[in-house]
């Protein structure tokens, strides 16, 4: 959920308090709290640094104006400082705009086939490969947690975990969620299916769900008594030996009916751990959506971005065109997009989101 605009004075006080707390050995006796405080401190640091630069530039401008009263050679310096102040003011305003607290997070992404039978499943697999290739371009790690394949090798459904930890690219500091949070919704494809003998273009669709993954499972309260855990024999593409033991795990959260399965890790314990992480992500998303609905039923969510029944994008193969209906984006490079070249589209979506946030300032 987007955070409200905050006063710079409040943030400066919080930053100073966190700096003192992080220097206190007592805080580090609770590693989880120490990590939480450290993440918040790191989040505030660039805001504080920009504010200090702005104050310094304003002081320099005042001095330059006083000196210019007796020496016209300072006029150029005044113009430079005024330009610098305008730039810093814009940066600080952007930083203080409502932001997404999950920006640095990794994600769990689900792809599900929809109407269209086998063609929809094949398209769902195309989407999964598109996201995997995009992640590879950025040095992110992708783990296929669960998958159900169709007769022709498509995906009836697949669950991916995408992590930026250890990545070396510059975008990684913002997290996977900040780049991929706009992907949730219905994706429509227009093309000639492999099963079409008459060469006619068909329309089908697949759904994508995206959840920010909590830094730690403990950040989301899950009562063990609310869980039913079943184990069974894996049936995915886990390689030789994957089917020989009951290593797959299915977890049902009884109060909500949410079911999570994981079968592609090498052991039952690993599958259970990953399934709990996915469950935590889903429950966190559900809680935030409910809180948002309670706060304002008619306000557009910047985290969920669209109703999941809404068509957000069309992939037109005959024209090699991709269209994002939310922002009116069109490009004739569908082949490149499906190969993971998504940055131009994601930049456009991020720019539209930024503009929306700035309007709330």
Swiss-Prot record:
A GO cellular component entry from the record: cytoplasm
Principal location class: cytoplasm
PROSITE patterns, A to Z: RF_PROK_I
PTM summary: Methylated by PrmC. Methylation increases the termination efficiency of RF1.
Signal peptide: none
Residues bearing the modification N5-methylglutamine: 240
Keyword Cytoplasm: yes
Top-rank taxon: Bacteria
Record's keyword annotation contains Transcription regulation: no
SMART domains (alphabetical): PCRF
GO-annotated molecular function: translation release factor activity, codon specific
UniProt keywords, alphabetically: Cytoplasm, Methylation, Protein biosynthesis
Subcellular location(s) of the protein: Cytoplasm
Gene3D superfamilies, A to Z: 3.30.160.20, 3.30.70.1660, 6.10.140.1950
Functional description taken from the UniProt entry: Peptide chain release factor 1 directs the termination of translation in response to the peptide chain termination codons UAG and UAA.
Entry similarity comment: Belongs to the prokaryotic/mitochondrial release factor family.
The protein's name in its UniProt record: Peptide chain release factor 1
UniProt organism field: Mycobacterium leprae (strain TN)
